[in-house]
Structure formats: C-alpha cells, structure tokens
Regions:
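Hydrophobic alpha-helical transmembrane segments of multi-pass integral membrane proteins
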Residues: 1-210
Length: 210
C-alpha cells in the first residue's frame, strides 16, 4: 500500500483550518451571544482536536515520510491505518467534546488516541532500527515518541478526575501541565529537531553527519 504524503498533509491543513475556526468562535462568544455551544465544551474540543487532529497527525505524516525516504520498500499499510484511526478519533472528539464536554464517549476516544500513539511508537521504533545508526534523527525521534507516551499519564489522570467528579483544582492543573509539558517540550520539539536534522545536509551543504 502506497503512502500519499501530499494527501495527508493537505488533510492536516484542513484540520488546522477547523482549529482556527473554533478559536474564532470562542473569541466571538466572549463579546457576543452564541447560545448553541458551551464555551467550556468548545475549549475542550479545540484543544483536543488541535493536538490530535492537527499537530500530532501532521508530525506522524512527516515522520513516516522520513522513514520512507530511508527505506523505499517499506510497507506503509500499518501507518495508513494508524493515520485513519487517529483521524476518526480526532473528529469524534471534535463533535463529542463540542456537544457533551467530558463524557464517556469523549474519554473513550481520547484513550484510543493514546493506544494509537503506542502502536505508532511500536512500529516506528522497529523501522528506525533498520536505518543507519549514524543518522542523528533516530535518537530525536525515539525520545519524541517516548515523551509522547509519558504525557499520556496526565491525560489518564485528567480523564479519571472528570469521570469520577472528584475535582481537585491542584491535581487538575498538575495533570494538564504534566501532559502539556511532555507534549510541547518533549514530543513536539524533539520531533521537529529530528525533522530538522534529517534535512540538514540539504539546508546546510557543509553540515555532514555521515
């Protein structure tokens, strides 16, 4: 099964447009009456869809593109399935959070995205091991995927707080910031650095790692 990187990147940009529209809606509700959606629910939908449907989806696509360039005979069937599953869950969270906020459906969908992340890490680690050990991107991508999985601890605890109605502001903020820290400063940055180093030879001809 072939991998159409242009299709997946265009779809990720469509998701970015949806994220932007939700952002505009939230700001509109601050100054004007729009009773059809709860501001808090839209905020949850915006953040979850931005992370899963836009940023994570786009980073997955770029990481897969990197691995394909290193192995043209790579079977991308599992990666296509992972991207489809992640996309379905992202849109599911978009609608479930918008209408219900934290509910059984939205919690299940957010949990599934974590499972998907684990599957992606499993397959990607296997394919990374087939690449030349001198490639500097390998270590960055491995660290990025580990941070992505570690961040799920915050998500699980946040889901527990919301499902049990046992709200504690300190633990709520701790779980949110734990997740955000390992996403922003871990998964996102380390993936971007891995992508940067993968193109260093093209961007800076004098830079050589092999």
């Amino acid at each position: 099964m072939s991998f159409n990187v242009k299709f997946w990147l265009k779809l990720s940009l469509v998701n970015l447009l949806i994220v932007a529209m939700l952002g505009v809606l939230m700001r509109y509700k601050i100054g004007f009456d729009f009773p059809y959606f709860s501001q808090k629910n839209i905020q949850h939908a915006h953040s979850h869809f931005a992370f899963a449907g836009w940023i994570t989806q786009a980073l997955y696509v770029l990481m897969i593109h990197f691995i394909i360039k290193k192995n043209q005979f790579l079977d991308t069937k599992n990666y296509n399935r992972i991207l489809v599953a992640n996309l379905i869950c992202s849109y599911g969270m978009l609608f479930s959070f918008s209408y219900q906020g934290y509910s059984a459906l939205s919690i299940v969908l957010s949990t599934i995205t974590i499972v998907i992340a684990c599957f992606f890490a499993f397959f990607y680690f296997k394919d990374l091991d087939k690449i030349d050990a001198s490639n500097p991107s390998k270590s960055w991508f491995k660290a990025a995927l580990l941070f992505n999985i570690i961040s799920s601890v915050g998500t699980f605890y946040l889901a527990y707080i919301m499902a049990s109605r046992n709200f504690n502001e300190h633990w709520y903020l701790a779980s949110v910031y734990f997740y955000l820290h390992f996403q922003y400063n871990g998964f996102f940055i380390f993936t971007c650095l891995g992508l940067f180093f993968s193109e260093c030879n093209a961007i800076f001809p004098l830079f050589k790692y092999d």
